[in-house]
UniProtKB/Swiss-Prot annotation:
This is Altronate dehydratase. GO terms for molecular function: altronate dehydratase activity. The lineage of its organism: Bacteria, Bacillati, Bacillota, Bacilli, Bacillales. Keywords: Iron, Lyase, Manganese. It comes from Bacillus subtilis (strain 168). Its EC number is 4.2.1.7. GO terms for biological process: D-galacturonate catabolic process.
């Protein structure tokens, strides 16, 4: 493995690719550097002397400024680096577009064609509770259905989309819960859904039913638990009816243009911005060249890199949507008396990320170079092809669930620290470093750490990843599916009664 890398020609820091000891001498870009401190892999080394208040540059952009004089060879991290971020900013539209290097290869995956024309990558039977009070009933109901049915084919799996909400909520929180659940019920990865209510909740089953008048009632059933004597018997009977209606479901060839892929990172480290996130960026550009769609979220992790995305707005209308996306989320922080730059997390810092700009510039690598074609509010579903931005926080569970609810059939999740989590659609874990991939083979699905190895070409790893993604879209299970780790989390910002 190489010892270090200079990511961009304008950078004044090196990134350590292995642990480097104090006193080691590095020969880097025409300069001989004696390392002044012990440097952990993923952390930064000063490539030149940096005066107090001067910019620290990584990825070709400032990630903050020096809080003290820094000598060549010194460790650059939170002890001598400060963010440049402020609160609300003014922006101007200065478009800049790069040519997508990929072309349409007319490839396909094996998926499920739905009656409304949508395409799913899984064929699952879901119970969607209108309120958290019936989570337990739903679990028992599904277990009994599986026990009595035996062979659940053609369903790949059965799942309860458990959540804690649906009652005691007001305003936006109530509407968000309702909309996320409605989106889940319509999701193309579900071949059938039982919508299970209690009977006294704010999120009334009758209102949900009104909003779903266009669904196939052989595939989507409704049950209010308080309105029947034996809710278990009634629920299992409805699940069996859905199962019977799905008997003819089978996979067929579907163009890659119909894939909608969410882009997410969590537990990021210093390698995220040079291995896994750029890999997702290249895959995003490749998929968009096939006519497909990708979605980037985690708005707080765009802070400090937002102008790059604004330059890529397809038109001025989209630019203003991005400005509103960023400033509205900053206002959310300000409203709650929180600094907009209170990020990265302790795990991020341990992995070498020093400021939010450092994290954000690495985070946005997942979006490649394609133009931004649309911006969605939380709870909205995809409307356009290409790269879309979605309003949601950085929290792994909430952001991944928001991507799935927006219509993404798969979520790609890069991580340098590791996580077992998955949302209610296939959540592919991509390791930023080989050490994590080898330590957690039951969590991690793909190793982007290869990109830090000597003589490993970007195009080779991309082609391996494309092949793997087509296999996943065609039914190959990822680790969180094998482990049955599937979660739904809904964003809450207001009062609970």
């Amino acid at each position: 493995m190489k010892s270090f890398i200079k990511i961009h020609k304008q950078d004044n820091v090196l990134l350590a690719l292995r642990d480097i000891q104090k006193g080691e001498r590095l020969h880097a870009y025409g300069v001989s550097i004696e390392v002044k401190d012990d440097i952990k892999r993923g952390h930064k080394i000063a490539l030149q002397s940096i005066k107090e208040n001067d910019s620290i540059v990584k990825y070709g952009f400032p990630i903050g400024h020096a809080s003290q004089d820094i000598s060549i060879g010194e460790h650059i991290h939170v002890h001598n680096t400060k963010t440049n971020l402020s609160d609300i900013q003014l922006y101007s539209y200065t478009p800049r577009f790069d040519e997508n290097p990929y072309s349409n290869e007319n490839r396909t995956f094996k998926g499920f064609r739905r009656e409304n024309g949508d395409a799913g990558v899984r064929n699952e039977l879901w119970i969607v509770p209108t309120v958290g009070c019936v989570n337990g009933i739903a679990e028992k109901m599904l277990q009994r259905f599986v026990r009595e049915t035996g062979d659940i084919a053609p369903f790949d799996n059965v799942l309860v989309l458990k959540h804690q909400y649906g009652c005691s909520q007001l305003g936006d929180d109530h509407e968000n819960t309702k909309q996320i659940l409605l989106n889940a019920i319509r999701h193309p990865n579900a071949g059938g859904v039982l919508v299970l209510g209690l009977g006294c909740e704010n999120n009334e089953l009758a209102r949900m039913k009104e909003a779903l008048q266009d669904v196939n009632l052989k595939r989507v059933k409704f049950l209010e638990s308080q309105s029947v004597t034996d809710e278990m018997e009634a629920g299992v009977a409805l699940l069996k009816e859905i199962h019977e209606a799905a008997k003819g479901d089978k996979r067929e060839d579907i163009p890659l243009s119909e894939l909608k892929i969410g882009l997410k990172c969590g537990g990021s480290d210093g390698f995220s911005g040079i291995t896994a996130n750029p890999l997702l960026g290249r895959f995003s550009d490749y998929l968009i060249a096939q006519g497909g769609s990708t979605v980037l979220t985690e708005v707080p992790e765009m802070f400090g890199a937002e102008t790059i995305l604004m330059q890529r707005a397809a038109n001025e209308e989209v630019f203003h949507k991005i400005v509103d996306l960023i400033n509205d989320f900053k206002q959310y922080f300000i409203k709650h008396d929180q600094p907009v730059y209170e990020n990265p997390s302790p795990g991020n810092k341990a992995g070498g990320i020093s400021t939010l700009e450092d994290k954000s510039l690495g985070c946005t690598q997942k979006a490649g170079i394609s133009p931004v074609t649309d911006v969605l509010k939380y709870g909205e579903v995809l409307k356009t092809k290409g790269l879309t931005l979605l309003s949601a926080p950085g929290n792994d569970l909430i952001a991944s669930s928001a991507l799935a609810a927006a219509g993404c059939q798969i979520v790609l999740f890069t991580t340098g620290r590791g996580t077992p989590f998955g949302t209610f659609v296939p959540t592919v874990k991509v390791a930023t470093n080989t050490e994590l991939y080898e330590a957690k083979p039951h969590w991690i699905d793909f190793n982007a750490g290869l990109l830090a190895e000597d003589d490993v070409h970007e195009e080779y790893v991309l082609r391996e990843f494309i092949h793997y993604m087509i296999e996943v879209a065609s039914g190959q299970l990822v680790n969180h599916e094998k482990n049955d780790f599937k979660e739904l989390a809904i964003f809450k910002s207001g009062v609970t009664l």
